[in-house]
């Protein structure tokens, strides 16, 4: 069974020859460039200049030899976006600064900095108004340059029998709105001025539909999975109440998913939402989510055995292979092995599972733990 057959089989809730393996197909299933360099060396691969899938997060785009050496099954398509396109860094004293296409300023410490963090939002607090939303210079997601060459790349990946995932070019309705006006301010608006918050959410929907309605007529037949993201969970609960999600966010996501269904009916719909999103899972299913990521196994309510029991016939689980908060960075190789074995035992029966870490692999993860994860997966991820 080849990689694409393996992915399609598991997404149809059947058991392939082994669990499909993802590392790096999206900007939420990736690996930090420092960890990537060390892992290449551990597998005897030569040094190479790192190409980034996401410069803001410092994520490496895995090279062909790495994909082959580790037995990775899935390749990613990355439309041009603020994290990988025209990233021009300027000197800001102790920081590197980057002004992106949304008008958001990011900064990274020059000394030991690993990531760019948001420093200034363009419509922060009182700057947000109906007029400022209307007049802000929003990015153009109908620009064909955003997907230039992606169909040819996807077809190349398919010719080599890989599964192909295309990522949404910007963060989710809720999360991208936070980046525009500030998280604290948006949360207050949702409670005190939901109509104003709604105008910003509607703009995000408009931009997403601009992208998918122009990109999918070109790419729909060349992708197996379309990946979208919006974080609603914390370690123990949700960032907003389920009622607020259902009233203000859910109907807007349904518009986006309906657009994707219209233009790419055969592609599976992947949705990333960190933390404890257990109360929202039925809502995700209702709007059209078919694949849930990351399966935050150490968050309250996200026990993989219970999730598989309750939703294993409705959702493909993608991720959750090893805890990236504690065990992978701070545990022993044996603890990593046991965690991988447990999560495979919970999630792989009956298909409907793709192996990946709970979230991106960070720079401080010991290489021996990554090797333990990969080799344990290879040993126990077989049907």
Label each PLM-derived region with a short phrase:
Residues 1-40, 45, 49, 98-99, ...:
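Active-site loop segments of alpha/beta catalytic cores
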Residues 2, 58-65, 93, 145-148:
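Generic alpha-helix structural propensity
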Residues 32-80, 84-85:
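Segments that shape or occlude catalytic/ligand-binding pockets
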Residues 65-69, 86-99, 153-159:
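Short, charge-rich binding segments
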Residues 76-88, 93, 142-146:
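Extended, Lys/Arg-enriched charged tracts that mediate electrostatic binding to polyanionic substrates
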């Amino acid at each position: 069974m080849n990689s694409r057959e393996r992915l399609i089989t598991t997404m149809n809730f059947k058991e392939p020859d082994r669990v499909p393996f993802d590392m790096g197909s999206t900007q939420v299933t990736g690996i930090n460039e420092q960890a990537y360099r060390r892992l290449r060396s551990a597998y005897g691969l030569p040094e190479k200049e790192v190409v980034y899938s996401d410069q803001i997060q410092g994520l490496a785009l895995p090279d062909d030899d790495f994909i082959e050496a580790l037995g990775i099954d899935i390749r990613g398509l990355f439309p041009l976006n603020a994290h990988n396109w025209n990233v021009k860094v300027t000197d800001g004293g102790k920081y590197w600064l980057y002004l992106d296409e949304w008008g958001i300023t990011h900064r990274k410490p020059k000394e030991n900095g690993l990531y760019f963090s948001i420093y200034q939002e363009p419509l922060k607090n009182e700057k947000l108004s109906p007029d400022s939303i209307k007049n802000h210079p929003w990015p153009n997601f109908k620009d064909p340059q955003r997907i230039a060459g992606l169909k040819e790349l996807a077809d190349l990946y398919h010719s080599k029998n890989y599964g192909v995932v295309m990522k949404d070019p910007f963060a989710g309705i809720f999360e991208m709105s936070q980046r525009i006006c500030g998280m604290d301010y948006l949360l207050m608006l949702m409670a005190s001025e939901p109509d104003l918050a709604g105008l910003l959410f509607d703009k995000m929907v408009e931009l997403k539909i601009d992208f998918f309605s122009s990109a999918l007529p070109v790419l729909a037949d060349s992708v197996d999975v379309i990946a979208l993201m919006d974080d609603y969970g914390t370690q123990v609960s949700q960032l907003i109440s389920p009622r607020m999600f259902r009233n203000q966010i859910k109907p807007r996501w349904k518009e986006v998913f309906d657009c994707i269904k219209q233009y790419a009916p055969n592609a599976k719909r992947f949705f990333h939402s960190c933390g404890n999103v257990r109360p929202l899972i039925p809502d995700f299913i209702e709007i059209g989510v078919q694949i849930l990521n990351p399966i935050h196994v150490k968050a309250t309510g996200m026990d993989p055995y219970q999730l598989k029991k309750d939703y294993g016939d409705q959702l493909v689980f993608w991720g959750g292979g090893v805890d990236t908060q504690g065990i992978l960075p701070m545990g022993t190789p044996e603890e990593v092995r046991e965690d991988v074995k447990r999560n495979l035992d919970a999630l792989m029966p009956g298909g409907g599972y793709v192996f990946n870490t709970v979230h991106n692999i960070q720079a401080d993860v010991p290489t021996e733990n990554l090797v333990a994860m990969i080799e344990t997966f290879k040993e126990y991820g077989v049907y």
